[in-house]
Structures are given as C-alpha cells and as structure tokens.
C-alpha cells in the first residue's frame, strides 16, 4: 500500500507536472531542440499510461512492481539517460511510420461510422420520444372520453333513485333518528277527524292557494270622496228595510190577540 502511494506520487510529480512545465518553457522560448525532445517524451509517456492500465490489473501482484514502475518513469525523464528519446527513435517511430496509412484509414472510418451511429441513435431517440408522446396522448384522450361517457344521460338514468346517505354519529343515534310528523286529520287512536274526508293530508302535501286577484288601479281623489259620501245612504236604506220587516212581523200577532 505504501509503495503504491509513493509510486502514484512520483508518476504525478516527475511524470506529468515537471514535463508539462518544461514543455511550456520550450514553447515560450521557441527552442526547437527542446520542443522536439518533450514531444517525443509525451508520445512515449502516453503509450506508457495505456500499457499501465492493463499491467496494474494483471501484473500488480508481481514483486517490486511499483518500484520498477517508478524507476522506469525516472529513466524516461532523466536528461542523462534520455530514455524517452531512445525508445521513440528505436521502437515508436519505425512502427508508426510502418502502419501510418492503416492508422489513418481506421481513423477516417471511425469518424464516419461515429457520425452515422450518432445520427442513427438520434433518429431512434426521436422516434421513441414521438411514439411515447403519441401513446400518452391517446391514453389521456381515452381516459377523458371514458369520463365524459360516464356522465352521459344514459348512465344517469340507470342510477337508482334513493335517499341521499346521511352521516350518523354513533354517540348520538337516538337524537339523529328523524321523527315523521303524522298526517293532518289523523288522531292518536287511528281515527280521523271527519268521516266525509276520504284522504288524509300529509305534511308533504301542499294546500292549493287561490289565485291572486289582479291589482286594481288606485282610486282618484274625487272618486274616493264620492264613495265616502254614498256609504251613509246605504246604511239608512238597510235600517228602513229592517223596520218594515219588523212591523210586518208584529202585525199578525196583534190580530191574533
């Protein structure tokens, strides 16, 4: 564990940070010799990192594996050994120049295929999204149509006519029992008030009321005075008729006597 931590620290500092700063100095000073040197180093170091990914999985159990890796990185970087330049000139450059055309064709094919695959995946994704949207819309329309169909008149007619449910408190059941009023004309003993009535009126039946008379026009001031003046005459006539009737009734009584 300690050797692994030390190895990672050495690779980070001496394999990446210091060469990056040296490359910056070479670009700034426009020193072609240093520029070529650090370019060869970065090519070799990139291949080393690619190989390290697999060796850490399969050969990490080998004794002194991390120590050998640290020594190799220092050997590549050292200005005395110049291991990166030597590996590049003897192995990397000849192999790359030998398979350069094949590598270029593979890169071009990979670009074209990647472009085609991206387009195909994009089309498939759009088709899947469109189909999902259509299915969701059809489902929502079906649900809405079902709800509207449930509110049709045919379904409403099939609903049984019954009393509306009422809430009953279990603690006060006696107080909540509705007491029906007895019908009008019904006595406690089961007899009716009048024998002529064939039916008993209940509290739910409404007695028909006479139609309202049309509202008469208000009398004028002169008409009201005439009516007031005529009233005493009507009373005198009635009193005279009463006197005549009483006299006629008393006359036969005198004759009998």
Swiss-Prot record:
Keyword entries, A-Z: Cell cycle, Cell division, Endoplasmic reticulum, Membrane, Microtubule, Mitosis, Phosphoprotein, Transmembrane, Transmembrane helix
Region (Disordered): 159-257
Membrane-protein topology: Multi-pass membrane protein
Biological process terms in GO annotation: cell division; endoplasmic reticulum tubular network organization; mitotic nuclear membrane reassembly; nuclear envelope organization
Modified residues annotated as Phosphoserine in this record: 152, 194, 202, 253
Compartment(s): Endoplasmic reticulum membrane
Cellular component GO terms held in the UniProt record: cytoplasmic microtubule; endoplasmic reticulum; endoplasmic reticulum membrane; endoplasmic reticulum tubular network
GO MF: microtubule binding
Sequence positions bearing Phosphothreonine: 196, 250
Main location, first listed in the record: endoplasmic reticulum
TM ranges: 1-21, 42-62
Keyword Cytoplasm: no
Keyword Transmembrane helix: yes
Disulfide topology: none
Pfam families: TB2_DP1_HVA22
UniProt function note: Microtubule-binding protein required to ensure proper cell division and nuclear envelope reassembly by sequestering the endoplasmic reticulum away from chromosomes during mitosis. Probably acts by clearing the endoplasmic reticulum membrane from metaphase chromosomes.
Assigned protein family: Belongs to the DP1 family.
The protein's name: Receptor expression-enhancing protein 4
Species in which this protein is naturally found: Bos taurus (Bovine)
Highest classification ranks of the organism: Eukaryota, Metazoa, Chordata, Craniata, Vertebrata
């Amino acid at each position: 564990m300690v050797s692994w931590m030390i190895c990672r620290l050495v690779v980070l500092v001496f394999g990446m940070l210091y060469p990056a700063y040296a490359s910056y100095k070479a670009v700034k000073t426009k020193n072609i010799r240093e520029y070529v040197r650090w370019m060869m180093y970065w090519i070799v170091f990139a291949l080393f990192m690619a190989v390290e990914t697999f060796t850490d999985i399969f050969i990490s159990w080998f004794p002194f594996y991390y120590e050998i890796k640290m020594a190799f990185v220092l050997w590549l970087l050292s200005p005395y050994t110049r291991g990166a330049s030597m590996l590049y000139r003897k192995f990397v450059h000849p192999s790359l120049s030998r398979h350069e055309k094949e590598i270029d064709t593979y890169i071009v094919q990979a670009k074209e295929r990647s472009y085609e695959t991206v387009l195909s995946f994009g089309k498939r994704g759009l088709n899947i999204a469109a189909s999902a949207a259509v299915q969701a819309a059809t489902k929502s329309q079906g649900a809405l149509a079902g709800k509207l169909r449930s509110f049709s008149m045919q379904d409403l007619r099939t609903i049984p006519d019954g009393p509306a449910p009422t809430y009953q408190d279990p603690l006060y059941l006696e107080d909540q029992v509705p007491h029906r009023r007895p019908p009008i004309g019904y006595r406690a003993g089961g007899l009716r008030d009048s024998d002529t009535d064939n039916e008993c009126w209940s509290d739910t039946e409404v007695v028909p009321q006479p139609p309202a008379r049309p509202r008469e026009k208000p009398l004028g001031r002169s008409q009201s005075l005439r009516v007031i003046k005529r009233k005493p005459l009507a009373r005198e006539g009635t009193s005279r008729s009463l006197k005549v009737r009483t006299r006629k009734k008393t006359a036969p009584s005198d004759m009998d006597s």
